[in-house]
Amino acid sequence: MPVSRRSFLGVPSPGAAAYSPAFVAARGREAFTAEPNSPAAAPTVPDAAIKLSSNENPLGPGPAAMDALTRAFVDAGRYPTNARPSMGDLRAAIARRVGVQPENVTLGAGSGELLRSAVRLYGSSSRHLVTAAPSFEQPERMAEQLGIGVRRVPVDKDGRLDLEAMAQAARWAGLVFLCNPNNPTSTLHPARAVAEFVARVRRESPDTAILIDEAYHDYVTDPGYATAVPLALEHPNVFVTRTLSKAYGMAGMRVGYAVGQPRTMDGFNRWAITFNQNSLAVAAAVASLEDPAHIEAERARNTEARAFTTRVFTDLGYKVMDSQANFLFVDIGRSAKGFKEDCARRGILVGREFPPLEKTHTRVSIGTIDEMQKAGVVIAEVLGAHRPVPAGSSSDSRRPR
């Protein structure tokens, strides 16, 4: 049998056993970024399928980013610290866009790297993680992998984070993960509520860090919303994470960032992967950040398609949570797994299951209007097979308008 590098080193495969906290600690400050994965988690996707499962921008990067990518190939042989634009240029572009100084910004390979680093920085066997249920899973998965306790606080009946219960759970915690707008429920809390929450946690548990994930902030239309960046600048151990994977259409390029006080950002930098950006992604990101008109157009496009898709479900009699993102969370009264499988057989890919609401709710990402019209027909067909058409509706009215 051929000798592989893995067998030569005697290293177990990632699926063979979980990495223990002792193993991680023994590696010192190495960038421990492994995540458990299996082939089943990433099935082959048919080219013809409409992909409404991962909250991606269906149009991809804007024209400025595409032009920058083409020009950047001349520097593809350079490390991203030496290319032009460089990683330093990207930090400066983010700082200008957000209204902070470059020292208030740190970069990540998508915001996922930063979420995992936050758990490593602030969590421990005696300092638990607080998160909502359901919410984005990466922080709790990293905590479980490292043997850090997790306290999951159920969302309320409208899918909003229960800030009162989360504040109570935050006492003696290492880290609170606050996703606003929340994935998968798509709901948000206004600026005042977030500010009051931060002030309370800082008062009652001053050593607890607060991570406010704003991955979907570019899609928000609620006038009561405001970014938490000012809170991150005001308070130590409070920070905001964002990504260019959503509105900027750069999910495959893995560009994310965090904003906070310089000392807080230094903590992330100690855990960061060396060269956690590539020179092509840096060039595209800088160009995108300098093209705010493209993001405004993307927000308008998503708002129109989101409203259309909301009507598809409400016309069928289903409750849709108040979406402030590029996806919907819908009470379909049946399992997300079964709905996903029925849609997939018809060429529509929708979101994964989100415990503890996986028996009743599904997440559907927003594509183009054309994609949502086609998906609407399939959704009506799939749900119609499991629930009667609302009284007074004809079979024609079940088709999206």
Explain the meaning of each model-derived region:
Residues 1-29:
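N-terminal export signals
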Residues 27-110, 117:
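N-terminal small-domain helix-loop-helix segment of the aminotransferase-like
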Residues 62, 237-321:
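PLP-dependent aminotransferase class I/II
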Residues 101-105, 127-128, 207, 214, ...:
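Short acidic capping loops at alpha-helix termini that bridge into adjacent secondary structure
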Residues 121-142:
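Conserved PLP-anchoring active-site segment centered on the Schiff-base-forming lysine
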Residues 155-157, 302-303, 312-346, 362:
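Conserved PLP-binding catalytic core of the aspartate aminotransferase-like
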Residues 161-171, 184-210, 214-247, 263:
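Active-site pre-lysine segment of PLP-dependent enzymes
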Residues 342-346, 351, 355-401:
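PLP-dependent enzyme catalytic core of the Aspartate aminotransferase-like
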